[in-house]
């Protein structure tokens, strides 16, 4: 069975909102709606697990879930950090099949992205949606002085979904929690890099799959979704 774990535990602090960004309105729908819809319509996904804050579980059940999302089989409580929420989701699935892990604040995911990741993961066991960096990147010291300029040709900006064979990602996360070393863990690919044996293939998914973090992102995502 192939599962999509959709993370909806973020806050709205940088959006200057008391409502988590995943539940803010975007083109007349909650932001999270678009991710759920994309996975619901995918032939490569059998079930969806939504991980959210405890206080929003009933809201999701009453206002978002329903017949339109038949694949949404579980709505569960997340953890304090992103990796805690992913781990909570992973404990709900079997060792077989593939797992899409996706940030619910990326509403512009589409079938092309899902399909491209699928075609890659069945060959590699581990891949992430990404895009080559367009801007020059500087490494700074503690005083915000530039100290180094990495070769831009080697840099990619990482997105979601991050897709893995279920046994690969569950084993990596199990070892993460066994080692109890969470410093610097920002995404799932990093967990596999540290504790797995699979190389991570980057899948060029372009620049429209943005993560909503600021009010400006909401405006841009709205334009992308209108197509």
Swiss-Prot record:
Question: Per the record, what are the reactions this protein catalyses?
Answer: 2-C-methyl-D-erythritol 4-phosphate + CTP + H(+) = 4-CDP-2-C-methyl-D-erythritol + diphosphate
GO BP annotations, alphabetical order = isopentenyl diphosphate biosynthetic process, methylerythritol 4-phosphate pathway
Task: List the EC numbers from the record.
Answer: 2.7.7.60
**Keywords, alphabetical:** Isoprene biosynthesis, Nucleotidyltransferase, Transferase
Task: Give residue numbers for the site Positions MEP for the nucleophilic attack.
Answer: 152, 211
**Keyword Nucleotidyltransferase annotated:** yes
Pfam families annotated for this entry? IspD
Role description = Catalyzes the formation of 4-diphosphocytidyl-2-C-methyl-D-erythritol from CTP and 2-C-methyl-D-erythritol 4-phosphate (MEP).
The Swiss-Prot or TrEMBL record describes its family as follows:
Belongs to the IspD/TarI cytidylyltransferase family. IspD subfamily.
Q: What is this protein called?
A: 2-C-methyl-D-erythritol 4-phosphate cytidylyltransferase
Q: Which organism is it from?
A: Lachnospira eligens (strain ATCC 27750 / DSM 3376 / VPI C15-48 / C15-B4)
